[in-house]
Amino acid sequence: MNKHILEKDVQQFIKANREKSPTEIALKKSPFPNVSSAELASQIDGWQRSVKKLPTWAYSEGIYYPDKINLEQCSSEHTALIKQTLIAKGSRVIDLTGGFSVDSCYIAQEADEVIHCELNEKLSEIVAYNATILRVPNLICKATDGIELLKQSEDDAFDYIYVDPSRRVNQGKVFLLEDCEPNIVANQELFFSKSRYIISKLSPLLDISTALSSLKHVRYVYVISLDNDCKELLFIQERGFEGETKIHAIRLFADQIQTFEFTYDAERSAMSRFSEPQDYLYDADVAITKAGAFKSIGKAFGLSKIHQHSHLYTSENFFPEFPGRVFQIQQVLPYSALKKNNPFVQANIATRNFPDKVDLIRKKYKIKDGG
């Protein structure tokens, strides 16, 4: 961490040039003897990456930005807010995998103390400094291995363990928990000896059912999406819990949260109805489909599926609160009709469980994108 970057004239330069191309800044000579043009470009790039993802950081004076990869890997403030809601007031929390501390800072709004463990000493120093700027005095930064610190702690030293394991390099196409560091499957007994709750942030590539077979005492699974893009999975384990896991599919918006809850037992027992397309077509959000609520969502809204494997739904009724996209059906045509008389010069095209891909349809029938 180059503390000269925090000097007033350097900060003024960064603020005055933060809308410019970082590459342009990097290619020019630095006006400061102790701060390189590459460092200036890195800070400007960090601000630009944070404007939408981390507005609290971006619009706080004097924030020090880490390497690009740390910003790419960190949570957004949208998803960090979900973790905050999981924490009881007055708790003691340890974040085993630290990073840029977005989740830790939000968790610290509820907890009495959050121990932030980060092996990268430079990043740990940056986080500790930024915590003073953001006024998070209960974030305690330790430049150390979180697992080793946990082993040295007393039993029940914490109320929550938070962990965001990273996938080890050179693994196969199948995403397995055992391929991650730290290995939360192998360390479950250690974790439960130190804390009642374990909150694991996991990749949306992970198969939820496979993870549930590897993890013990899972009370909740959260599937979180933003703009119909699945961002992360949260597994909440509670020591001694033996009940049925509840699945929460969560859609995040700029100013609200939409949640759909179900269980896999209820999903297995639900029966789907089928019909031809009616007045409205319903396309469930990715949080719903990733969670696996294919029959539960149809049952909840009284919808019929148009095909067993397409996961598109239809109804005579309009439900504005449906978690996904809703289209009013104007006309239903057989695909073969396009060969005889194609009425579309320009259109948005989407397919489900269909042999021809979108690009092929556009090429075959000369349909431009948009509509």
What are these regions (language model features)?
Residues 1-371:
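SAM-dependent transferase fold signal centered on methyltransferase-like domains
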